[in-house]
C-alpha cells in the first residue's frame, strides 16, 4: 500500500505542477529548496513505479498498427442534471485546459500513435439495451461496453458478453485493474466484466465518509487521519464522535432538519458500506464457481446488530437519515446543503458527491474510509454503489479478440498515469487546497474495495433491500428474518451461478 501511494503521489504531482508551482514557491522562505525536495521525491517515486511489475508496460511495441481503426465504446448518456455521473472519460474532441478532458485527449493520442487506433464514443440513454440488440443481430458496431455493474451482471447472466479471461493482453494483475474486486466478479473461470482505471464512474461510485472540520474541531475530536492510520477508526468511535457533535440548537427537545446540528448523515443504503466495511462476506465465491452462503454467519449477524444499533430510526437524536424525508422536493440536494451549512458532522456518501459539495462549501472537510467494526479487524474495507459504478465488458459479437484485448488493456494502462491522476487532482484541488491526507485516504479506499456478487445481482437476490429493512428497524430480529429469506436468496444464487458458468456464453 505504501509503495502504491508513493507512486500515486508522483503521478499526482506530475499532473498538477503547472497548476501549483507558484503556490509551492511561497510556502517557505526558500522556494527553491521546496521545489527541489518535491522534484527529488517525485523522481524517487517514479523510479519505484518503473520497477513495479504491476505498472510495467508489457504491451507490444512493433507490428501492431491497426491503420486508423475506430474502436467504439458504448456508454451512458446521462441527463443534463446528472452532473456527478456525466461520462467524460471516453473521447474528447480537443484540448480545453480542463484537467480530465486534456488527460483523456492525451491518453487517446498515445493509443493512436502506438497502435493506429482512434477511440470513439457512442453514448445512449440505455446502453445495455442498445448493446443487446446489436449483439443479437451479430452487429459489431461497438468494441467495448461501459455501463453499470448492475447492468453488466444482468447481461452476463443472459449470455451477451465474452469471457474476458480469453482476451489476449488483458492482465487483471496490473495496477490499472481493480484487483480487489476480482475475487467477487470472477465465477469459476469466467470474468464477464471488470472495473478499470479508464471508467471514472467506477471510482466515483465508491462509498466513503466526509467529516466537517469545523464541527470536529469544535467538538475536540483528534486528527481523524491519524486515527485511521492507527487502525482505531471504528463504528463505536464514529457513534461517540457523532453524538458529541449533535446539538439541539433551539433547545426544543426535538432534532429538526435545517435547524439543529446532527452528528452523522446517511441513507438506508448506507448499510451496504457499513456492513462490507466490517469485512463481512454475504455470498463467498469459491475458485470452482460454487458459493458459500454467509448471510447467517456469526460475523454478519453480529455486524448487523451493531449497525442496527447505529442506524435504527429511533436514533434521530444524532442521525439524520435522508430516506425519512422522501416527500421533500430535491431532498438529496438539500441533504448536501445540511453538511455544507455546518449542520452535519459526518456524511456517508459516494465519491461522486464530493465535487458537488466542494465548490460552495465554506468550511473545510476531509475524506476518510467507512469505519471498521472494531480495532481487532485486520484492515479497512470499502465498496461502491453497484447501480452507479461503471465497469467494462466485451460483447460476444466481437470479431477480433486480439485487437479488443490489446486496446482494452492499453486504455487502462494509459489511463493509470493520465486520467486517474487528473481525476484525483480535480477532486482534491476543488477543495481549494492540496490535501495529501485525503489523497492517501482515497488510495486506501480504492485499494480495499470489496465486491459481493449478491449485491451485483440485487435485482434477483433482493439482498440489499433485505439488509436495509433490518438496518433501520427499531425492533431487531435479524436471525428469524434471515431464516425466512434464505431460500429466496439461495434459489436466485443457484440460477445465477448456473447461467454464468454453463449458459450461452
Positions of the model-derived regions?
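C-terminal motif of bacterial Sec signal peptides marking the signal peptidase cleavage site
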Residues: 17-21
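Short, well-ordered beta-strand elements
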Residues: 67-101, 117-121, 144, 264
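Extracytoplasmic/periplasmic solute-binding protein
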Residues: 74, 139-145, 149, 187-209, ...
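Extracytoplasmic "Venus flytrap"/periplasmic binding protein-like
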Residues: 114-186, 219, 338, 359
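Short, solvent-exposed loop/beta-turn-alpha elements that line the ligand-binding surface or hinge
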Residues: 169-177, 281-302, 375-382
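Glycine-centered hinge/linker elements that transmit conformational signals in sensory
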Residues: 239-242, 282-327
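Extracytoplasmic/periplasmic substrate-recognition and gating elements
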Residues: 358-428
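Conserved C-terminal helix/tail region of periplasmic/extracytoplasmic solute-binding proteins
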Residues: 393-405, 415-505
Amino acid at each position: 500500500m505504501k509503495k502504491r501511494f508513493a507512486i500515486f503521489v508522483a503521478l499526482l504531482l506530475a499532473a498538477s505542477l503547472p497548476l501549483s508551482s507558484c503556490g509551492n514557491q511561497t510556502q517557505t522562505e526558500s522556494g527553491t529548496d521546496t521545489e527541489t525536495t518535491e522534484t527529488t521525491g517525485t523522481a524517487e517515486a517514479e523510479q519505484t513505479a518503473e520497477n513495479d511489475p504491476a505498472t510495467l508496460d508489457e504491451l507490444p511495441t512493433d507490428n501492431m498498427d491497426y491503420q486508423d481503426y475506430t474502436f467504439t465504446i458504448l456508454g451512458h448518456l446521462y441527463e443534463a442534471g446528472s452532473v456527478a455521473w456525466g461520462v467524460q472519460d471516453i473521447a474528447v474532441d480537443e484540448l480545453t485546459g480542463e484537467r480530465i478532458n486534456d488527460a483523456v485527449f492525451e491518453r487517446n493520442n498515445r493509443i493512436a500513435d502506438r497502435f493506429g487506433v482512434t477511440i470513439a464514443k457512442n453514448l445512449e440513454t440505455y446502453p445495455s439495451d442498445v448493446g443487446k440488440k446489436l449483439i443479437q443481430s451479430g452487429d459489431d458496431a461497438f468494441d467495448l461496453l461501459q455501463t453499470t455493474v448492475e447492468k453488466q451482471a444482468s447481461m452476463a447472466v443472459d449470455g451477451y458478453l465474452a469471457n474476458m479471461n480469453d482476451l489476449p493482453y488483458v492482465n487483471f494483475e496490473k495496477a490499472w485493474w481493480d484487483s480487489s474486486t476480482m475475487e467477487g466478479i470472477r465465477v469459476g473461470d469466467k470474468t464477464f466484466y471488470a472495473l478499470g482505471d479508464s471508467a471514472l464512474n467506477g471510482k466515483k461510485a465508491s462509498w466513503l465518509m466526509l467529516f466537517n472540520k469545523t464541527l470536529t474541531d469544535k467538538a475536540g475530536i483528534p486528527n481523524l487521519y491519524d486515527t485511521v492510520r492507527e487502525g482505531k477508526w471504528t463504528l463505536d468511535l464514529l457513534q461517540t464522535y457523532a453524538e458529541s457533535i449533535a446539538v439541539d440548537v433551539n433547545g426544543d427537545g426535538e432534532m429538526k432538519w435545517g435547524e439543529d446540528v446532527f452528528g452523522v448523515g446517511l441513507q438506508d443504503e448506507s448499510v451496504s458500506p457499513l456492513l462490507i466495511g466490517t469485512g463481512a462476506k454475504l455470498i463467498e465465491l469459491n475458485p470452482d464457481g460454487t458459493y458459500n452462503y454467509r448471510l447467517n454467519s456469526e460475523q454478519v449477524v453480529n455486524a448487523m446488530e451493531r449497525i442496527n444499533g447505529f442506524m435504527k430510526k429511533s436514533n434521530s437524536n444524532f442521525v439524520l437519515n435522508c430516506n425519512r424525508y422522501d416527500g421533500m422536493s430535491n431532498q438529496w440536494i438539500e441533504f448536501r446543503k445540511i453538511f455544507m451549512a455546518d449542520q452535519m458532522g459526518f456524511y456517508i456518501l459516494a465519491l461522486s458527491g464530493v465535487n458537488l459539495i466542494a465548490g460552495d462549501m465554506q468550511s473545510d472537510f476531509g475524506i476518510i474510509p467507512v469505519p471498521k467494526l472494531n480495532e481487532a479487524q485486520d484492515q479497512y474495507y470499502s465498496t461502491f454503489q453497484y447501480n452507479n459504478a461503471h465497469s467494462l465488458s466485451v460483447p460476444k459479437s466481437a470479431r477480433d479478440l486480439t485487437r479488443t484485448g490489446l486496446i482494452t488493456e492499453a486504455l487502462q494502462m494509459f489511463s493509470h498515469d493520465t486520467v486517474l491522476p487528473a481525476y484525483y487532482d480535480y477532486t482534491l484541488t476543488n477543495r481549494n487546497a492540496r490535501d495529501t491526507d485525503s489523497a492517501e485516504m482515497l488510495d486506501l479506499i480504492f485499494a480495499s474495495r470489496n465486491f459481493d456478487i449478491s449485491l451485483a445481482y440485487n435485482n434477483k437476490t433482493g439482498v440489499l433491500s433485505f439488509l436495509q429493512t433490518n438496518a433501520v428497524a427499531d425492533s431487531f430480529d435479524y436471525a428469524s428474518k434471515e431464516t425466512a429469506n434464505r431460500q429466496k436468496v439461495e434459489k436466485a444464487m443457484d440460477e445465477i451461478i448456473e447461467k454464468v458458468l454453463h449458459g450461452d456464453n
